[in-house]
Amino acid sequence: LSKVNVSMSKSKSAFFCQNCGHEAPKWLGKCPGCKEWNTLIEERTEKTPKHVVSFSKSSSAQQAVLIQEVQKSEESRIPLQDFELNRVLGGGIVPGSINLLGGDPGIGKSTLLLQMAIKEHLKVLYVSGEESEQQIRMRAERLGLDNPHCYLLTETNLQQVLIQAEQIQPQLLIIDSIQTLYTESVESSPGSVVQVRECTANLLRFAKQTDIPIFLIGHITKDGTIAGPKVLEHMVDSVLQFEGDRHHIYRLLRSIKNRFGSTNELGIYSMQGNGLLPVANPSEVLVSIGSEALSGVAVASMVDGIRPLLIEVQALVSSAAYGTPQRSSTGFDVKRLNMLLAVLEKRCGFRLAAKDVFLNIAGGIKVDDPAIDLAVAMAILSSNADLAID
């Protein structure tokens, strides 16, 4: 009975913010950390002895050294055959790094990393908590299985995953997804704030001690942010965002955070039946080339990060069939569209108040660069006058 009491005394209940991970001893309507309302949920945690986390490969106590005396690492980046992912990561995968990939459901996150696992000539351990081994094998064959050293593991227990990783010693570890993992040291369900934080901390420690790079797939919330505590993005070395419209074939890979490279790089993929194909010249596929010039179409040049792109702006202007004119935009901010229409009406004298205006950015990409405002205005005026732009 005394042992039971001791065991139960080691567990406690606390409230954690789902947005930023702030811990509070009781429920609060407003989070003191991020100032958001109704984001605190109750989690049961287990009190474990707190140890100092060291990323050194030796267990002895560390002494402070001069920065000039620190030996440089001789290990270089691991280059990838996927030149778009290679570009976004800054030239390849850094050994011992931990990378987080987020994106909408069904956008292609698992496909991108599974493709990397089966096509790169590396020893890879692919851990999935969402699919069976048979399902992954079927997808791998469709994508073109070309790696005899790709290991599959369907497991959600983090301790078992780390044991397998220590035995196999892969050159790359992929976790699909971090929200499905759980550690036995925390008494809460997988995907909770505490579980995501503790699992990521253990994986981070493992990566730094073994120099095995890790890729994590993270789910996102309704507002587009990665699910889990905000501290998750601070713990990892890079945060990659995979975005695009599921009804279009093109996908964009952006680097939101990168400790080992630039965050201005952009990768573009085309979703085909045999997987995600890198697009070397995106301007060639984002702009339609036809023999007949059409009204309401304008081509603009823009820079996304440090990558120049040519994009096609398509506009349709017609008389309002109903009382209130409609304003619709795909890939472009509708508030900015309304502002441009007001400028054309007020300063340029074009009567557009009684017109329906529909705007689309070809290719399904989202653009927020103000450099295309002129192209948007010209496409609208071209459609209104039914005159093609030469």
Task: Give the location of each predicted region.
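Conserved RecA-like ASCE P-loop NTPase motor core of nucleic-acid helicases/translocases
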Residues: 124-128
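P-loop (Walker A) phosphate-binding loop of NTP-binding proteins
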Residues: 104, 129
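Short, Lys/Arg-enriched N-terminal segments with co-localized hydrophobic residues
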Residues: 1-7
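Conserved Rossmann-like nucleotide-cofactor binding loop
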Residues: 132
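General small-molecule cofactor/ligand-binding pocket signal
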Residues: 151-153
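Peripheral, non-AAA+ core regions of ATP-driven protein-machinery
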Residues: 9-12, 16-19, 23-89, 94-100, ...
